[in-house]
Every structure is written in C-alpha cells, then in structure tokens.
Amino acid sequence: MTAPVWLASPPEVHSALLSAGPGPGSLQAAAAGWSALSAEYAAVAQELSVVVAAVGAGVWQGPSAELFVAAYVPYVAWLVQASADSAAAAGEHEAAAAGYVCALAEMPTLPELAANHLTHAVLVATNFFGINTIPIALNEADYVRMWVQAATVMSAYEAVVGAALVATPHTGPAPVIVKPGANEASNAVAAATITPFPFGELAKFLEMAAQAFTEVGELIMKSAEAWAVGFVELITGLVNFEPWLVLTGMIDMFFATVGFALGVFVLVPLLEFAVVLELAILSIGWIISNIFGAIPVLAGPLLGALAAAVVPGVAGVTGLAGLAAVPAVGAAAGAPAALVGSVAPVSGGVVSPQARLVSAVEPAPASTSVSVLASDRGAGALGFVGTAGKESVGQPAGLTVLADEFGDGAPVPMLPGSWGPDLVGVAGDGGLVSV
C-alpha cells in the first residue's frame, strides 16, 4: 500500500485496526522461538564439528572415514548458516515488534478522536452569530493533523515491517548425507517379495457376506410374519369353527417355523463360518506367499556367505592331490650288511625271547633279480562276494619287522613271500617261534 491509500481512510480506521490487533506479543514469541532454534543449530554444529574433526584426525581410517567427513562437512556448514539465519530472523521479528509498538504509540487514539468530534459538535451547536468560527477552524485543523499523522504512522509502520520481511533470510534445504538410491535395492527387494494384503478381495467378500446376511434376515422376518399370520388364522378358525382356516393356519405356521429355523440355525452359522474361513484363507495365503517369496531373496546372501566360508577350506584340501599317485614298488634292494641272524630252533621248538637274529648274512649279488610277490597270509579274497581275486600282485621286498627294541611294537613281523610257513609270530620281545 502507498501513502495516498493510507490518506484515503480516516484516522479512526487506522487507530481501530492497529489497537485491536494481536499486539507485539506474537512477534516477540516468534522472535524467542527463532532465537532458541538458532542456539540449537549452533549446539548441534559444534558437537558435529568435534566428531568430524576427530574422524578427520585419524580416529577412523579408510575410505569410509573419508566418505563420512566428505558428507558431513557440508552439513556442518549448513548448520552454522542455519543458526545465523535463525538469529537474523529473530532480530527481524523483534524489529517488527518494535515498529508496531512505536506505531501504536504515535497513532492518534480513539478517545482523542472522539474528543475532537465532541468538541466540534459543541462548537458548531453554540456558534451563534459566528462567534465560534475560529475555534471550529482550529478544531478541524487538529482533526486534519490527526488524519495526516495516522496516515504517516501507517506508512512508517509499513516500511519497517516490509524491510524486516525482506531482510529475513530463507534457509535452504539441508545437504544430502545419504547417497541417493542407497535404499532403492532394499526397497525393490521388499516390494518384490512382500505383496500387499488383498484388502480389495476382502472388501468384496464382506460386501457379498453383508448382502447374504441381509437376505437371511429378511427370510427370518418374513418367516416370523408368516408364523404370526398362521397363528391368527388358527385362532380364528378355532373360534369360528372353520376347519379349513385352522388347517391353513397350521400349514402356514409349519412352513414359517421351518423357514425361521433354517435361517437362524443353519444359514446364519454357515455364513459366519464362511466369513471366518475366507478371512483365514486370505490371511494364510498372504503369509505363505510372502514367506516363500522371501526365501530366494534370503537364500542368496546366505549361500554367498556359505560359499565364501567353504571355498578357503576346500582350497586347503588341494594338498591331498599328491596322494593320487602311489609310487610303484621297485626291485628288491640289497640286504643290509648286518642282518638279523640265523634262526636256530631250540629244543621244544621255542626260541628264547631274548634271541635276536644277529648273525651276519651275506647280501645277495646285485645282479640277482628277486621276484617280489604279495604274501598270502591272513587275507582272503577282497572285494564283493563272488568276485575272483587276482594272484598276480606285487610282493613287498625284503624283511619288514615292525617290532622295536623294547617289544612295544607288533609282535608278528611281515614276512617275505619266499619264507616258508614254518615260522609264525608269537607274543614276545620281538622274537620268533618255530613250529
């Protein structure tokens, strides 16, 4: 609004509007709220600045810490700017409140204007022979002064409030901390796996059930009315001695009773059961479909984690690959120079436990080829029942004795295939028994 517009209205209008308003209390309350918000922004900015500085100083390390600092530094700057903007907004609200107080103080009051009008009326009423011409002119000039003063005050108040409104800063939106689209994958999975509850189908079924209940209720009411009509016919026939009317009344009462019982004891329970059954089917079907729909989504990460845990263990088994090839048994090596001695049977056929095969035996010539055959002692045909065993199996070379010096090992040594069956192992200190 401009000054001529303010001058177009009498001062009573401006004074009444200004004095009848809410007053400066609302502006001062808003200023206090903006001040509190500014302090809150400043406190949060200070606390977050400490955290960001600690992270940047090396409390956390790695790319996550760098991303954290890069995301929160702009947010801290926004908090500082928001605190400053809130403080400025509080100051502008206080300026507007002060402008209102000044305008109210400078505005001609309604009692002053009423007194001016009363004085003017008295002067005009007592203006005999023009004796009050000068006082009337002065009174009117004073009213013009108040008119101009009211317009000037309103113009000044408008300028102050307009300047405060223009100077009030507008805080922009906070910077984005979380990356856009970070939750799109989980939301997509949830949308794909969790289907909404079929409320539409439930509403249609309940509508049909309500219609069915209404029809059953009408059947019950009509049956009750028919029973009442039949009862009246029965009573009338009995009173007037009209057998056909009595018969008609009894028939009507019978069919009415059947319809009433059918509606109350059969149709109503069936409808209730149908409603409960439909609710159970919809609920159970929805739950089962969501559970089985979520199984593939949950199985993917679980199988990935399981594979990550199993693959290192399987990689450790690769060391067993060397066991696939068993070295072939070569030719018999030459006998050692000091071989276990000659076996001289003792009387009775028992060799003393302390007897050791200590005598020297000349080794076989190197050119002598010793056939290696497997021993036929102790083991039968191997494999499934009915399969034929193979006799052409390589024999162990040399004498293999599993006993030690203390007799703690196996008492029966493995004998070469060239030895006869006249020696068997017996319990003892590593000795042999001849038979």
From Swiss-Prot:
Pfam families: PPE, PPE-PPW. Transmembrane segments: none annotated. This is Uncharacterized PPE family protein PPE47/PPE48. It comes from Mycobacterium tuberculosis (strain CDC 1551 / Oshkosh). GO terms for biological process: response to host immune response. Belongs to the mycobacterial PPE family. InterPro entries: PPE-PPW_C, PPE_dom, PPE_sf.
